[in-house]
């Protein structure tokens, strides 16, 4: 019986059994370690050299060679006069960052009387119009010249700004450190003197004055003329 069972089990084994490799089990000690790349040796003649820049994939996609340097975007050069001219958006951003309002420079509306434009000064009647180019040129020239003169004078007025800053600083320091402390110091005896004077007026002088007024309130004064005739009483 045993021989027949062995023959049956051998017949049931598939033919590909020998071709299938047994799974290999790796333990923790037998883990495969990747070989380390040898580090380049530093010599005295290669110490100051920089490493080669890595190739840019975007440069290769655009059609450049792998060894070529990456293409850098060119920045627009700004002239010195264009740096002073900033848009309203940039001024608002600087206002948020710095705290100086460069857009609304008259927040308290102190100089609304000088806020005059070309339309507030010049005007043509409906019956008489100049050429459009002439009117446009006058508007441009007036605005540009007025702005240039104002900026030039404001630059020349910098010494006056310094002088007024000195005056305001002196007056503010005198007010803070001398006048206000002196006023607070004098308010202590001044309060006592005010209370004493109020008591003297209401307690002594007021009754005396009211009594004298009641005494002399019934007196009548009559004025006589030259012929000793009585006239109307003068009250």
UniProtKB/Swiss-Prot annotation:
Compartments it resides in: Golgi apparatus membrane; Cell membrane; Membrane, Caveola
InterPro entries cross-referenced by the UniProt entry: Caveolin
Keywords, comma-separated and alphabetical: Cell membrane, Golgi apparatus, Lipoprotein, Membrane, Palmitate
Taxonomic superkingdom: Eukaryota
A Pfam match: Caveolin
Tagged with keyword Amino-acid biosynthesis: no
Keyword presence, Phosphoprotein: no
Topology relative to the membrane: Peripheral membrane protein
Regions that span the bilayer: none
Cytoplasmic side: 1-161, 183-235
Intramembrane intervals: 162-182
Biological process annotations from GO: caveola assembly; meiotic cell cycle; Ras protein signal transduction; regulation of egg-laying behavior
Lipid-substituted positions (S-palmitoyl cysteine): 234
Segments for region (Disordered): 29-72
Signal peptide range in chain numbering: none
GO molecular function, one term: molecular adaptor activity
One GO cellular component term: cortical granule
Record's subunit section: Homooligomer containing 14-16 monomers per oligomer.
Family classification: Belongs to the caveolin family.
Annotated function: May act as a scaffolding protein within caveolar membranes. Interacts directly with G-protein alpha subunits and can functionally regulate their activity.
Protein name: Caveolin-1
The species this protein was found in: Caenorhabditis elegans
């Amino acid at each position: 019986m045993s021989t027949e069972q062995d023959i049956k089990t051998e017949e049931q084994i598939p033919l590909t059994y020998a071709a299938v490799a047994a799974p290999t089990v790796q333990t923790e000690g037998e883990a495969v370690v990747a070989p380390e790349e040898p580090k380049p040796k530093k010599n005295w003649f290669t110490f100051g050299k920089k490493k080669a820049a890595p190739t840019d994939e975007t440069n290769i996609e655009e059609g450049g060679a792998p060894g070529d340097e990456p293409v850098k975007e060119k920045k627009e050069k700004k002239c010195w006069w264009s740096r002073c001219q900033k848009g309203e958006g940039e001024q608002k951003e600087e206002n948020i960052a710095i705290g100086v309002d460069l857009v609304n420079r008259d927040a308290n509306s102190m100089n609304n009387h000088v806020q005059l434009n070309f339309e507030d000064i010049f005007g043509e009647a409906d019956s008489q119009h100049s050429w459009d180019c002439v009117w446009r040129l006058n508007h441009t020239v007036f605005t540009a010249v007025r702005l240039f003169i104002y900026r030039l004078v404001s630059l020349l007025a910098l010494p006056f700004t310094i002088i007024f800053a000195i005056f305001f600083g002196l007056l503010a320091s005198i007010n803070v450190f001398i006048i206000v402390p002196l006023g607070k110091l004098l308010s202590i005896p001044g309060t006592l003197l005010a209370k004493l004077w109020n008591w003297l007026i209401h307690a002594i002088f007021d009754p005396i004055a009211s009594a004298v007024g009641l005494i002399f309130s019934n007196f009548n004064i009559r004025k006589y003329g030259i012929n000793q005739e009585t006239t109307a009483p003068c009250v």
